[in-house]
Amino acid sequence: MQEQYNPSEIEALVQKHWHDNKTFEVTEDANKEKFYCLSMFPYPSGRLHMGHVRNYTIGDVVARFQRLQGKNVLQPIGWDSFGLPAENAAINNKTAPAPWTYENIEYMKNQLKLLGFGYDWSREIATCTPEYYRWEQWFFTKLYEKGLVYKKTASVNWCPNDETVLANEQVQDGCCWRCDTPVEQKEIPQWFIKITAYAEELLNDIDTLDGWPEQVKTMQRNWIGRSEGVEMTFGVAGHDKSFDIYTTRPDTLMGVTYVAIAAGHPLAEIAAQTNPELAAFIDECKNSTTSEAELATMEKRGVATGLFAIHPITGKQVPIWAANFVLMNYGTGAVMSVPGHDQRDFEFAKKYGLAIEAVIKPVDGDVDISEAAYTEKGVLFNSGEFDGLDFEAGFNAIANKLVAEGKGKRQVNYRLRDWGVSRQRYWGAPIPMVTLADGTVIPTPADQLPVLLPEDVVMDGIQSPIKADKEWAKTQVNGQDALRETDTFDTFMESSWYYARYCSPHADEMLDPAKANYWLPVDQYIGGIEHACMHLLYFRFFHKLLRDAGLVNSNEPAKQLLTQGMVLADAFYYINEKGARVWVSPLDVATTEKDDKGRITKAIDKDGNELVYTGMSKMSKSKNNGIDPQVMVEKYGADTVRLFMMFASPPELTLEWQESGVEGAHRFIKRLWKLANEHVNQANSEALDVSTLTSDQKALRREVHKTIAKVTDDIGRRQMFNTAVAAVMELMNHLQKAPQTTGQDRAIIGEALSAIVRLLYPIIPHVSFNLWNELGNASNIEDSQWPVVDEAALVEDSKLIVVQVNGKVRAKITVAADADKESVEALGMSDEHVIKYLDGLTVRKVIYVPGKLLSIVAN
């Protein structure tokens, strides 16, 4: 065995072995329990970052652990390779998105292999290949045939100068990123999938996701946003028109003092014809992008329309205002405003001098709405026939009256909106729909799929090449001239079903149901919590679509979800001569000074610039504080990087990158190597004989088996990889102090090392593979079994009892493990130190905590 640990040499040899032997390639095996472990696949941006490394290390640890449990483990990888960054890079690098993407895939694939991740590369997929998106297109046509796909106009960001649609990321301070022209909102036809048809099931089935974090489940519940309320009809004074409003608080209906409608509401458009101020306000609202998130913080503004709504119960007229906080695409585009009991309505009413009336008060007191709205539920008053009713009774009484008079209906609403899947970009899967000469829109026939995206294109940075090339859209369907759809799919489409394609990546159909149903659902899914409401909801939705198409037989795509925390690093900058911040990589910081608590107080970079330290923040390009994993692997080895990633923090919390911690991980592996080397060179041939062990030997062996039990639980159930590593480190400390003089001493060390290399194999697989062979095992570690706890070894022959006299420790005594109180008390009382401290005192009380403590009270 080599005396020195040489990671680059070991890792290259072990990785070659895995590659040559196709170690991680798997097939379906009905006789073995399966385990499908999946980390969210990466976008091929060019290089892996530490966030990737953390995600994929966690996945690999879980997969390798399950393999040693004897399971048939699938751990695939692929590339989420469509998307806007490729278009931007292609423009900047004067190339096309395809070659840039494929080059990045090759580079990053090599990086993943250098980190030793045990992927089944035979199942690798790239979503930008026709072999993949063909089936996505096919499935979309099937959804269309089932009535789950439709087209309607929706608002997009429009650059009037370039005459092109902009993604949200391409709008900077309200202007086009390329030409700085103010961006407008434009209504264009787009394709939607009816996720709302599954809203109730998506919501209810959250309760079945026992292995998902509560935070993610709560976020999805809120995103789906089920509410029970009443949709009621308001008339318009002096007109034969009416409009609907939905509310979850019909108990406050008697306090309505005005109605707010969206700028795009038909009533606003009518009123604007004779109201120039309103017309200008509507135009302004149309050209401002307003997300729901922005609504909460932006200034609330409005203009009176001059129209009045008729209260559905009292018949009273209340003014109708057009307001910038009401969205036409959310609800009915109109809200009843009760400023006495809604803070937003209150502030708007105060601003514009509108009436504020209280109709709800606390059960046990009066209500004061002079400074703010009273938003709690309570008892109705100033509400005519409904006075004195509580929330529930008031809700029901008012709802029943509206229903009886034909002016309303009870309704369950969802915040969730249908999924708009059209993107006016080039680098995405073409949407497989065509328009015939007579204007009829139909799906592309199956025998004409895939609709190929041309890859040999020139990007001008303005228009999608398939929109600019008028010939591309021309096609024929059933002998008729037709025009292809030139929009492409939202890239969330590809990531919504990739997990299922891995089960049969080469099938000449979307999925091979037999293979899909063997592997699915995913047993462990790993990815960032930032995907909670988009990807993870679409992922669940698509699984239900696949189920209803007869392709899978489970209801949910993943049993367990682990959301790993971000990776943070120190961030430094200096101010240059132009007064701008220049962010400096932590690797370029030459010297630092720290206070007595270890906090950085001064830093200087390699060029002598004095730096401002801003603390730990998420690794990012903008702060130049990303650490290249490849640099760390070349310096310390993949196993060290993996070990640090697992040890530095619990997986769901943020991880603070500290190179001193990486060095510590490296030292630990060298200690393990040294201990194994010493053991191998001692050539011990004596087999372990537990019947001959001394009490010290039994105690050491007990530590070995306690560690096996803890690590098994920490990795397998708790997923606390950091405490698993800490337990092995503690065991190593015991082993390094242990004597190796007798054959049984060495036999225990041998048993311990055999356990340790398997316990650490999921985390540091290269060194574990090597040491397993050096320890004399005939088969490779991948074919071994996870170490099993010897329950007999955990049984203690004796216990160390702490003896206190009047609350102070005066002695420690060793007693038989099964000793009763009387014998422990007798031993304690006869200890020379205890006798000394009891001299001249009378024992008043003796308390025995079995196996731990003997407490004597005397005076």
UniProtKB/Swiss-Prot annotation:
* UniProt superkingdom: Bacteria
Signal sequence coordinates: none
Task: Name any GO cellular component annotation.
Answer: cytosol
Q: Which GO terms describe its molecular function?
A: aminoacyl-tRNA deacylase activity; ATP binding; leucine-tRNA ligase activity
**UniProt KW Cytoplasm keyword:** yes
The reply to whether Transport figures as a keyword in the UniProt entry is no
Q: Where is this motif: 'KMSKS' region?
A: 618-622
Reaction(s) catalysed by this chain, per the record, are: tRNA(Leu) + L-leucine + ATP = L-leucyl-tRNA(Leu) + AMP + diphosphate
Q: Where in the cell is it found?
A: Cytoplasm
Q: Which GO terms describe its biological process?
A: leucyl-tRNA aminoacylation
Q: What is the recorded name of this protein?
A: Leucine--tRNA ligase
Q: Which organism is it from?
A: Shewanella baltica (strain OS185)
